[in-house]
Regions:
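Extracytoplasmic gate region of multi-pass secondary transporters
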Residues: 43-47, 166, 239-293, 350, ...
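C-terminal transmembrane helical hairpin of 12-TM major facilitator-type secondary transporters
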Residues: 304-356
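Cytoplasmic helix-loop-helix junction between adjacent transmembrane helices
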Residues: 118-157
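Cytoplasmic membrane-interface "Motif A"-like loop-to-helix N-cap segments
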Residues: 85-96, 301-315
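Flexible cytoplasmic inter-helical loops of multi-pass small-molecule transporters
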Residues: 5, 210-231, 432-433
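Helix-to-loop junctions at the C-terminal end of transmembrane segments
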Residues: 75-87, 292-305, 393-394
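C-terminal membrane-cytosol helix-exit motif in multi-pass small-molecule transporters
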Residues: 170, 174, 196-219, 419-424
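Glycine-rich segments within core transmembrane alpha-helices of 12-TM secondary carriers
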Residues: 148-174, 375-386
Length: 433
């Protein structure tokens, strides 16, 4: 065998090994993200049961999520700084283990005096030491032409994990409360325990794993060039594209937040669905995530992520507008269908809006910091929306409260479409220049 043939075989083997490594790392990130976040977002399936189990009302539930949102906003910028300096695997291991321990405390249903503390600390363990390390690690694994695919596979893949865990949890919850005659509180505790032990088991797995030797291309991408923090912040804040991206994520996150109240809307919005039936529909909605996330990502790589994102923003906004009027026709099937459709579009949005970071001219060495800057503003709805949702549904009981809340969400969806169109126009001008 001649020298050229040998080199060709070595190159092919190296590329195959690099691809196996990158997709293996992606799979681990997917499992971690799909397990850690549902712990504190069980309201999207069990909101009414949560209120009964914890002995609180809608407004108090809003305070809990607002406290967690405050922790998120405080965490995002330092999270980006940490992601630029510490190994992601260690940060992710800590996050999983700490979140699992918090979930065990949460499962004791300690009362409203302690619940805000649990939710605030949950915001730190899933925000400060997890969020930016997750996204920076993912961006470094994906080639330039794979950004949409990798981010879509992250969101879609974690959707498979979330939906699988949610289906198992719902089966246990229904069996214990319907067949075994246990209370809603006991059934809800069982659900929390499932997520708690899953997080702890994953933390042990990540702790035992050893970081494999990275291919040269990946190592080069991940190299950190230390710079002045204030200078880096000044540089990033002067990028118009980064601010437009922030607006897009901010508005898109409003659309996603609307899905958290779908279970309560189906149950309390005059449609007459039971807690189990509403939970079944919203669990089915979770299964839209792999289709929306992965499908949107693959389509984004073919057409550009931003174009697909614009279409998804428009359709999700129209879907929520349709949900506002669905109760006028008392259409259970229509409302359930809209919930699934909105879920599909919203998950496509989530799978794509971080992929557009690639067109914002952000250097690799400050990617984590850029993610932190965008996240601080774009995820601030974590503070405001729980309060808005809690106040409107508490002061305007039934369908009216949800119509007011969803009308605000639709307005934000329209603004998101406008921001995306402006960014698309700027990119087109830059390419034409």
């Amino acid at each position: 065998m001649d020298m050229k043939a040998t080199e060709a075989m070595q190159d092919a083997s190296s590329q195959q090994g690099s691809k196996f490594y990158r997709y293996g790392q992606l799979a681990l990130l997917v499992v971690a993200a799909g397990t850690i976040y549902p712990v504190f977002y069980l309201r999207q399936v069990y909101q009414s049961s949560m209120l009964v189990a914890m002995g609180i009302d809608n407004q108090q539930l809003g305070y809990l999520y607002s406290s967690m949102g405050t922790a998120f906003v405080l965490s995002y910028l330092p999270s980006g700084w940490l992601a630029d300096r510490l190994p992601p695997r260690l940060l992710i291991t800590f996050s999983l283990f700490a979140t699992g321990l918090l979930a065990l405390w949460y499962a004791t249903l300690p009362g409203f005096d302690y619940l805000p503390v649990i939710f605030f600390m949950g915001g730190l363990t899933t925000g400060l030491t997890f969020w930016a390390p997750l996204l920076k690690r993912l961006k470094s694994l994906a080639a330039k032409e794979e950004q949409g695919r990798f981010f879509g596979m992250l969101d879609g893949g974690r959707g498979v994990i979330e939906a699988s865990l949610a289906t198992i949890a719902l089966t246990l919850f229904t069996y214990q409360t319907s067949k075994q005659g246990q209370s809603l509180a006991e059934g809800f505790q069982l659900v929390i325990h499932l997520y708690a032990y899953s997080c702890i088991a994953l933390a042990i797995l990540f702790a035992l794993l050893r970081d494999p030797r990275k291919p040269a291309a990946v190592t080069e991408t991940m190299q950190v060039q230390k710079g002045n923090l204030l200078a880096d912040l000044n540089f990033l804040c002067r990028l118009p594209e980064l601010w437009l991206m922030t607006a897009i994520v901010f508005c898109g996150y409003h659309l996603f937040w609307a899905t958290y109240s779908f279970s309560a809307y189906l149950e309390q919005g005059g449609l007459g669905l039971s807690a189990a039936a509403a939970a079944t529909v919203t669990t089915a909605k979770l299964w839209m995530r792999p289709f929306g996330g992965i499908g949107g990502g693959l389509l984004g790589d073919r057409l550009t992520p931003l174009r697909v994102l614009i279409c998804a923003l428009v359709l999700a906004t129209l879907g929520i507008a349709g949900l506002i009027i669905a109760t006028m026709f008392h259409g259970v099937v229509l409302a359930a269908g809209l919930v699934l459709f909105i879920g599909l579009m919203v998950y496509a949005i989530r799978g794509l809006y971080w992929a557009i970071l690639d067109v914002c001219n952000v250097p690799v060495r400050v990617t984590g910091l850029a993610i932190g800057i965008v996240s601080v503003i774009a995820y601030s709805p974590d503070i405001l929306l729980p309060l808005i949702n809690g106040w409107t549904t508490q002061h305007f009981p039934g369908v009216v409260g949800y119509q007011i809340y969803y009308s605000y969400i639709v307005t934000m969806g329209v603004l998101g479409v406008i921001a995306a169109l402006i960014l698309n126009k700027r990119i087109a001008k830059r390419k034409a220049a």
